């Protein structure tokens, strides 16, 4: 309930929860969310497993040491954290929810078209194609994947339009969406804003880029 409100905590807020704060249900829940994230994120799980070695340090030094261990990954972790708390639900997979890179098997096609392969089992995948605010372009998609099953013999096969047997946030389950990641923005919140407010695509959609990215 605290997501997307003034009570939302970023990664550094999580680390700065005082010891007395764990008597508060709100802070306790946020701390466990942080543990789930750090324990399962591909770039933090090994470091997280070594935290008992830092337990003898005072709170301030513990936090500094922990942040220093993440080095150049901190900005990436901040983005992934925001995506995590926006989507977290029962059964959520942190590794699959992290930003990843879309593959480009065919390179650039004729007429300025570019082809990418998107993995249906992962969340946002970056194409590394730059767009300018107001630029219009069309995205077409094809393929088939399974998004669920009634039983082992009845898989829910799906195409990029999604299936209306179940909806997620007002859209058919499995429907293709697009978002603009603005890595030039100053904060992680501004960088992933376009991913938290995705554009509907399905099998085909024309986008007028709301921002550059």
Predicted regions located by residue number:
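Acidic/His/Gly-enriched intrinsically disordered linker/tail segments
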Residues: 1-93
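Gly-Asp-aromatic-enriched flexible segments
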Residues: 90-213
């Amino acid at each position: 309930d605290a997501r997307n409100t003034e009570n939302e905590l970023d990664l550094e807020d999580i680390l700065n929860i005082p010891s007395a704060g764990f008597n508060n249900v709100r802070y306790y829940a946020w701390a466990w969310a942080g543990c789930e994230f750090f324990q399962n994120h591909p770039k933090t799980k090994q470091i997280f497993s070594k935290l008992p070695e830092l337990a003898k340090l005072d709170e301030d030094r513990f936090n500094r040491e922990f942040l220093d261990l993440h080095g150049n990954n901190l900005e990436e972790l901040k983005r992934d954290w925001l995506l995590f708390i926006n989507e977290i639900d029962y059964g959520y997979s942190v590794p699959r929810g992290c930003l990843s890179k879309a593959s480009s098997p065919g390179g650039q096609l004729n007429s300025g078209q570019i082809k990418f392969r998107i993995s249906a089992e992962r969340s946002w995948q970056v194409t590394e194609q730059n767009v300018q605010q107001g630029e219009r372009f069309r995205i077409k998609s094809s393929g088939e994947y399974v998004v669920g099953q009634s039983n082992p013999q009845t898989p829910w096969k799906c195409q990029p339009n999604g299936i209306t047997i179940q909806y997620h946030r007002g859209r058919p389950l499995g429907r293709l969406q697009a978002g603009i990641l603005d890595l030039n923005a100053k904060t992680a919140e501004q960088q992933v804003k376009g991913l938290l407010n995705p554009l509907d695509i399905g099998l085909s959609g024309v986008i007028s880029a709301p921002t550059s990215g």
